Structure formats: structure tokens, C-alpha cells
């Protein structure tokens, strides 16, 4: 009987109650707020990291571009322009022949300008590009006012390349230098040169002045050499020489045989 009693006592003994920890009213809300703050902080950090990575990639790309040689940059730009032209060809398949030629001329002109900017980056091409278009220069016939020519519209007076400027020179110089013997030509030439170079930078004007000084020195040497030659020729022409017309012979006559007697002096 004793063991059964012990069993009953063990069964009747209940475990001690667990005292539950009392929660404060704001404890759950603080946990939620902390989780929100942590989420916001992590989002800000991710944005900062993304911006930093983007800035780093951009800086690396710029550094890589700067390391490229000028020739590489030119080739890349040419390739880009060719790709753009090919894209335009595919988009403008319906254009006529005249439009296609005009587009190709414009593309070639833009490519030449870009090439010049790449090769001569220190030259202010924007200043030349932004210069106002030339005014109309109309020359009319005095006897027939209806006969007029706008020189500014002629392709000759719209040079853009070295060969085109050379053509302007070879066209105008023969027309102008034919007047060089006229009294007003020298004064006109001085004013003409000033007007030609007044819009150029001082460095270019200095180079032009130096070339004129060199030309002046060469002309002075030529003139001095010519003066010396003329003086020698003139001296040779004006040299006095004794010219005798009588034959050179020995006089054998005696002065005593002159046919006069002593009494003739009396």
C-alpha cells in the first residue's frame, strides 16, 4: 500500500507556476521602431554605396579616356560618325539622290571640322564659327544696273580649306598687282593689309609682320645689288678716253726748213 501512496503523492504535486515577465506598454512599439530605423539606415547606406560605385566607375572611365592618344580619339570619333551615317542611311532609304549628296557633303564638312578641332585644339575654332556671315557684296554695271553680281554668294569667296584659300590668292593677286605702278598703290596696300589682319590675334599679326620684314630685307638686298651694277655700267660708259684721228708717225722735217729766212722776222 505504501508505494501506491507515494505514487499518489507524486501525481498530486504540481510543478511550480512559471512567473511570466511583465511586458511594458511601449516595449513592442520600440522594437518595431528600432526595426524601421535599422531598415531606413540600411537603405541609406545602400544608396550611398551605389552612388559611390557610380562615381568611381565614371572617374575610371574618364581616366581611361584621358589615357587614350589623340589618334585613338580621332579614330573612335570617325567610327562613331560612320555608325551614325549608316544609321541615317537605313532610316532615310526613301531620300532622293540630291538629298543624299547634300547629306553626305554636310557629313563630310562636319567630319573635316571635327578633325581640325582634334588636330589643332589650341586654335579657337568656335570664334571663327560664331563669326557673323559675310554681308552681301554686290557689284553692278554702271551702264546697266540690272547686271549685278553678289561676290559673297560665289563659292570662290567662301574658302574653308588651304587649297581653297590658295585659289583665292591665285585669282586676286594677278588682278591687283597690275596696279602696282600707280602712285596710290602703296598707300592702298598698307590699308588693305591692316583691314585683312585686324580681326586676327596679336600672335598671328606678329607673324605676318615678321614675314613682311623678311620680304623688305630681301628687296633691299636686291635693290642694292642692282644699284651697284648700274653704277659700274654708268662709270664704264662715262669714262673719258683720248681719241686721236691722226696716224702715228715720226716727224722728220726740220724746223730750219720752214721756208722762212731770218729777214722775215724783221
Swiss-Prot record:
Under which name does UniProt file this protein? Eukaryotic translation initiation factor 3 subunit J
The record's annotation in Pfam families points to: eIF3_subunit
Q: What family does this belong to?
A: Belongs to the eIF-3 subunit J family.
Starting at the broadest rank, the lineage of the source organism is: Eukaryota, Fungi, Dikarya, Ascomycota, Pezizomycotina
InterPro entries of this UniProt entry?
eIF3-like_dom_sf, eIF3j
Q: Which residues form a coiled coil?
A: 40-82
Biological source species: Aspergillus niger (strain ATCC MYA-4892 / CBS 513.88 / FGSC A1513)
- Keywords, A to Z? Coiled coil, Cytoplasm, Initiation factor, Protein biosynthesis
Q: Where is the composition biased (Basic and acidic residues)?
A: 45-61, 73-85, 98-111, 218-230
Q: How does the record describe its quaternary structure?
A: Component of the eukaryotic translation initiation factor 3 (eIF-3) complex.
Q: Identify the main location.
A: cytoplasm
Regions of compositional bias (Acidic residues) in chain numbering: 26-44, 86-97, 254-266
